A protein has these predicted regions:
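Residues within mature, well-folded domains
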Residues: 1-78
Length: 78
């Protein structure tokens, strides 16, 4: 599966409900972070530390990233 194939329903099934949500798919404002344009961001805190970040633009997933406890960030392969 690629990030572009990930839907909101599949993300909830795979990762659960996010711990934090910033923006929403209907928000007309777009932001850019880590080279990704988005208007909704889901943040999951990981048990081993760090977090998983899922970026959405409208209903399209724009990328999934994993932040390590040391703050380094890598795109997650789905």
């Amino acid at each position: 599966m690629t990030a572009s194939e990930l839907t909101h329903a599949l993300a909830r099934e795979r990762f659960g409900l996010p711990d934090e949500q910033i923006g929403n798919v209907n928000d007309p404002r777009t932001r850019e972070e880590n080279g990704v344009r988005w208007n909704e961001k889901w943040i999951y805190r990981r048990h081993e530390g760090g977090k998983r970040i899922v970026y959405w633009h409208r209903y399209d997933c724009r990328g999934v990233f994993v932040e390590s406890p040391d703050g380094s960030l890598q795109r997650e392969s789905l």
